[in-house]
Each structure stands twice: as C-alpha cells, then as structure tokens.
Amino acid sequence: MDMTNAQRLILSNQYKMMTMLDPENAERYRRQQTIVERGFGLQMRELDRDFGEMSEDTCRTIINIMEMHHALQVSWDNLKDKQDLDERRIAFLGFDAATESRYLSYVRFMVNTEGRYTHFDSGTHGFNSQTPMWDKYQRMLAIWQSCPRQYHLSAVEISQIINA
C-alpha cells in the first residue's frame, strides 16, 4: 500500500481516535497506528488486505453462486422423486476462511448486511467451508447456466451440478 506522508498522518490520527472510541479493540488500533506511522512495509500489506478491493465481476460471480444454490434448493423442494439426492449436498457451504477470505467476507456482507439469502444456513462456522470451494463452484455454475430451466431443475440436472 503506497501512501504519502500526509495520508499516513491522517490514517494514524484515525487509528488514534478509534482507540478512544473503541477501547475493547484499542490494542489492535495502536498496533495499526504504529505500523502506519513508521511505514513498516511488510505489515502495511495487512492493512492493504483490510482495504482490499473486489472487482464487480467477482462480486457478480459470488452472487451467481449463491443464486445457483437458491435455485438448487427451490428445485429440490419441488421434486416429487428425489432419486436418492442428499439435501446436504445442495446446501451452500460458503468459502474457505484460510484461502478465500475475501469471498467469505462478501458472502457474510450479502447475508448479514444486505439481507439477501438469509434462508441459507450459515452453520456453526458462519459460511466458512473450511476447504477451498471457488473452483468447484465455477464448475457447478457452468453446468447450471447451461440448463434451460434454471429454477425447475430435474433430479438428473441437480445431480450433474452437485457432482461437477
């Protein structure tokens, strides 16, 4: 993160104010203030993650992934013959906190702040799948988007999507 001295001073002052406004997290803000004031390059990358950017395309892809899971659930609910489909395989698991934290953060924002897909079960880990899911979801999306009736999927189509 490249910042001018003036920008670093402004951010340092913001962290100083946050220590007073939020005493429970004061130690964290003091640490961040020190990093900014001294310009520690390695630790500045941590701040870059906090202020990172997610492209519009990535956001739309995540929404499409969540919408696909909604469609899977609606289709599964409407099936008369479930053909040994396990409902747990249809559930949206989220993303891996260790390797896909930005995606996970966006999912939590969409559910908790925007109020979308609130019917999804966040589980005990708050949509942390604890295993990387991005590639799997991409394969699933490709199949789902090729289905002619995306919200009226057959058992065979559901099976193809979840087994992608």
UniProtKB/Swiss-Prot annotation:
<dbReference type="InterPro" id="IPR005587">
    <property type="entry name" value="UPF0304_YfbU"/>
</dbReference>
<dbReference type="Pfam" id="PF03887">
    <property type="entry name" value="YfbU"/>
</dbReference>
<dbReference type="InterPro" id="IPR023146">
    <property type="entry name" value="YfbU_alpha-helical_sf"/>
</dbReference>
<dbReference type="InterPro" id="IPR023145">
    <property type="entry name" value="YfbU_helix-hairpin_sf"/>
</dbReference>
<comment type="similarity">
    <text>Belongs to the UPF0304 family.</text>
</comment>
<protein>
    <recommendedName>
        <fullName>UPF0304 protein YE1336</fullName>
    </recommendedName>
</protein>
